[in-house]
Amino acid sequence: MAPKAPLKNLLLGQFVMARKVGIDLGTTNTVVFIPKKGIVINEPSVVAISVLDNKIISVGNLAKEMIGRTPDSIITSKPLVDGAIADYRVTEAMLKYFIKKAGGFLSFVKPEVLISVPAGITSTEKRAVIE
């Protein structure tokens, strides 16, 4: 019987493989790709926000389901409109949510992220995505 690899090495190996993330930040959908896993997320670029405390309530499919069905205290927003970033804060929150949802990342090590953005993005918007 072959000796088993220590659990630490197995976990570290899985983590190293999942350190890179590709994101297609589109006006309609956001797609997240992880090498050797493929597309792990393909959800609408929609965010639901609480007007009362200005907090993000849901992102993606759940937020899309809320369009037209929310009370006055909740708004749904598409942070990208006509190939441009309409709301930087909401776009940032959406990106963080999708990266976290893609999973497999330790909180103290940031993944390498490649983000594809709409062609009509301005230099200011490009800088905001990079930050």
PLM regions and their residue ranges:
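Nucleotide/phosphate-binding catalytic cleft detector across ATP-hydrolyzing
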Residues: 2-131
